[in-house]
Amino acid sequence: MKAIFTAFFLFLICNHIAGSVWAFDSQDLENFELLKICENCDLSEANLKYGDLKNAVLKNSNLEGANLHAADLSGADLTGANLKNANLSEADLNGAVLRGVDATGADFDNVNFLRADLREANLSTLDVSLERLEGATLCNTIIKSGTQNKNCR
């Protein structure tokens, strides 16, 4: 019985520590949901699935592991954001600014990149034909097939 209690206690402590290390900042999320502006925020692991994030400002924010599946990020500014291992499948990035983002390991399945600014972005796990990136700005943009330069100004 003592062993079970000890194991349960250790489980609770580990969950608390892991939760505080890996979870988003709840105040950042609350402010973002209210204003759609959150620069330098910690929204790591946040569930923003199907979110209406049109024209949101998330400059230099931590969105590592965030769930942005089917989110409307059209016109959003994600300059310098950490999108490592984020789920952006089926997201709308039409006209979004992803300049300098690190999206290593992110899921971009069926994403709309029309008019997106992808300059200096690390999308190294993005396995996509250049036709799907038609209309996007690619300058020193890293995708799975290598560094791309297209529509540079």
Model segments located where?
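Cleavable N-terminal signal peptides
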Residues: 10-11, 21
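Positively charged n-region of N-terminal signal peptides that target proteins for export
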Residues: 1-8
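Tandem repeat scaffolds
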Residues: 24-153
